[in-house]
C-alpha cells in the first residue's frame, strides 16, 4: 500500500481501520506518518490518542510475553533444567530486542517531534507522561547500567510532567490522574519504594475526591476509572496479604484520556 502518499486525514483514517482490524503494527506506521508531518503544530486530541493506542497495544503484547517467559524461566531454574533455561533465555532475548526497538521508536518520536511541538499544558503532560511510560517499560527488563539509565530517564520525564500537571491541570483531570497512577507504579515496581508509591497514589486520590463535584460529564468516566485503579493499587500495596501472584498492579487503562488508549 502506497501509504506514503496518503494525506494526514487519510493516514488517520487508515490508523482507525488498522485498529478495528487489530493490526497495531500498521496502526503505529500510519500514526507515525501523521506525527512526522506536524512539526509546526500539535496533533489533535484524536490523533495523539490513536498514536498512544497503537503503541500501547504493540508494546503491551510484548510486555505480557516477557512476563510469561520470565515466569517459566524462574520455574525451570528452580527445577534445575539448565538446558531449557538456556533455550528460554535466548527466546526472552528475542522479545527484549523487540521491546527495545518499540520503545526506542516512540521515544525518538516524542523527543524529536511531539514534545517540542506541544504548547498546551494538557498535551505537554500527555507526552512527557508517555515518555516516562516507555522509559519505564525499558527499566522493566534492562539490567545494570542500562536499567539505571532507563529509571533515571523515567524519573526525569514523570517529574517534568508532574510539575506541569500540578500547576496547570485540575486534580480530577484524567491525564493528571493517569500520570499519578503510572508514576506511583514506577516507585513501587522499579524503585522498590512502596511508601513513596502509596503516598503519591493516596495524595492524587484524595485531591481528586475533594473536587469530584467539579468533574465535567465528558471526563467523569475516565477520571473515576483511574481513581478506582489508584484505590485498587493502594489496597494491594498496603495489604499484608498482597503476595498473591494473581494480583495485578494497575496502570492507566488502554481506553482513557490519560493514555488515550
UniProtKB/Swiss-Prot annotation:
SMART domains: 14_3_3 (SM00101). Signal peptide: none annotated. Disulfide bonds: none annotated. It comes from the Eukaryota. GO terms for molecular function: DNA binding; protein-containing complex binding. GO terms for biological process: protein localization; regulation of gene expression; signal transduction. GO terms for cellular component: cytoplasm; nucleus. InterPro entries: 14-3-3, 14-3-3_CS, 14-3-3_dom_sf, 14-3-3_domain. SUPFAM superfamilies: 14-3-3 protein. Pfam families: 14-3-3. Is associated with a DNA binding complex to bind to the G box, a well-characterized cis-acting DNA regulatory element found in plant genes. Belongs to the 14-3-3 family. This is 14-3-3-like protein GF14-6.
